[in-house]
Design a protein with these regions (language model features):
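Acidic/His-rich, divalent-metal-binding segments that scaffold phosphate/diphosphate chemistry
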Residues: 1-94
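Divalent metal-dependent catalytic cores for phosphoryl transfer on phosphate-bearing substrates
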Residues: 62, 68-156
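Conserved small/polar residues in nucleotide/adenosyl-binding loops
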Residues: 157-164
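Hydrophobic alpha-helical segments, chiefly the membrane-spanning helices
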Residues: 170-173
Length: 174
């Protein structure tokens, strides 16, 4: 019997080895609403990027919206646009390895190629500025033979404040 979980409904075990089928059925009933709420949680987390400029010309939310808008206007598919939107969602939680956060969120839903691009966009962007901060701008070359290297190296949407020469309807602020 499947039903919505109640707040009081809990598994009885304290160690996973002691879980029963009923315990796991209870946990499963709690998991479904959690999984179904992912989009709302990601959008709420994106809003945390508002006002966080990090020294850039626009805040991180505006940058994310601009990036997704450019991808949409370029005719990219829905998965690509979503990846463009969430590519920096991890900035607040994990600034050093933020690309891995967005990539982990979308991994079950997008192609291996899009997941790879999202997971590696940070090291590829490093090409444009790492030499200014004492890092190896060519670190991305470790992936030169990877089939998605060229797709990730593309500069189409990588600027903190992307400017579209074609008269985009990009938001200038969030």
């Amino acid at each position: 019997m499947s039903h919505a979980p109640t707040g009081a409904e809990r598994a009885a075990f304290h160690q996973m080895k002691d879980g029963t089928a009923e315990d796991w059925a209870i946990i499963g009933r709690h998991f479904q609403p959690l999984a179904e709420g992912l989009t709302d949680r990601v959008l709420a987390h994106l809003k945390l990027l508002a006002g966080d400029h990090g020294g850039f010309a626009v805040d991180r939310l505006t940058h994310s919206l601009q990036t997704a808008t450019l991808a949409l206007e370029d005719g990219r598919d829905e998965d690509y646009v979503v990846c463009a939107l969430v590519h920096d969602v991890g900035d607040v939680l994990a600034p050093i390895n933020h690309p891995e956060i967005g990539a982990a969120i979308v991994r079950p839903y997008v192609s291996e190629k899009l997941h790879w691009i999202l997971a590696h966009h940070g090291i590829f962007q490093g090409y444009y500025f790492w030499h200014h901060i004492g890092l190896d701008r060519n670190a991305r070359d470790a992936y030169r033979d990877h089939p998605h290297f060229e797709a990730c190296a593309c500069l189409l949407y990588t600027s903190p404040s992307p400017r579209d020469q074609r008269g985009s309807r990009m938001p200038s602020s969030a």
